[in-house]
Amino acid sequence: MLRKGVSFVGQAVQQTLKTQKNLRIQRFSATASQSSEEVNYEIRKDGKRLRGADYEEIVLTSIAGEDKTQIPKGAFDVLLKEYDDLQAESLDFKDKYQRSLAETENVRRRGIKQTDDAKVFAIQSFCKDLLEVSDILDIAVKSVKPEDLESGGKALKDLFEGVSMTRTVMAKTFAKHGLVTVDPTNEKFDPNLHEAVFQIPSANAKQPVGHIEVCTKIGYSLKERPIRPAQVGVVSK
């Protein structure tokens, strides 16, 4: 009987303690729920975003004693709006970044073009002067006939070879710096690129009217820019 009495008293005490604990939790939860409604969940302070740890502390403090796996509605609404704001800012930054890249690329291309233009302008006059020398070398080489070389002796042959080599080296130097010959024979006449020095009646020409039948003096272009027009004979009606 004594044991049963002790057991009964122990159960009664445990039940009383459990009831008191539940009452304390209910009172604390009600207080926390009420306080969470009054908490300011704004994630910005003085125009600056709070750190994650600081905002977490605010939220956890407001739900002390409650289920910490649930976010208060006020905090959820703030975080949802903050997400939308961050997404909009991200898109804005991305757009500005892409525009900045495009502008940087345009500046780089303009810089390269301006540098190339400056280089071409710097050597253009010098190239024009050298073209006259090249023309003279061409005339000198073409004026010597094979039979003249046979009868002219060793001195003439050596001179001819020296002039030919000079002409070849000059042509390679021209090509190295982007200066190339332009022979528009058989092409359509373009007054912007060619200089018509005479006309050929279509009855005596192989090319159609308006085309170049013969080139009497080759032209030159520097970096794809004409610096001397080719002198040509154009087919006319």
UniProtKB/Swiss-Prot annotation:
Biological process according to GO: protein folding; protein import into mitochondrial matrix
Recorded superkingdom: Eukaryota
Major location (coarse): mitochondrion
Organism the protein comes from: Caenorhabditis elegans
Any one GO CC term of the record: mitochondrion
Record-given protein name: GrpE protein homolog, mitochondrial
Role according to the record: Essential component of the PAM complex, a complex required for the translocation of transit peptide-containing proteins from the inner membrane into the mitochondrial matrix in an ATP-dependent manner. Seems to control the nucleotide-dependent binding of mitochondrial HSP70 to substrate proteins.
Keyword Transferase appears in the UniProt entry: no
Family: Belongs to the GrpE family.
Self-association state and partner proteins as the record states: Probable component of the PAM complex at least composed of a mitochondrial HSP70 protein, GrpE, tim-44, tim-16 and tim-14/dnj-21.
GO molecular function per UniProt: adenyl-nucleotide exchange factor activity; protein homodimerization activity; protein-folding chaperone binding; unfolded protein binding
Subcellular location: Mitochondrion matrix
Signal sequence bounds: none
Pfam families in UniProt: GrpE (PF01025)
CDD domains listed in its UniProt record: GrpE (cd00446)
Alphabetical UniProt keywords: Chaperone, Mitochondrion, Transit peptide
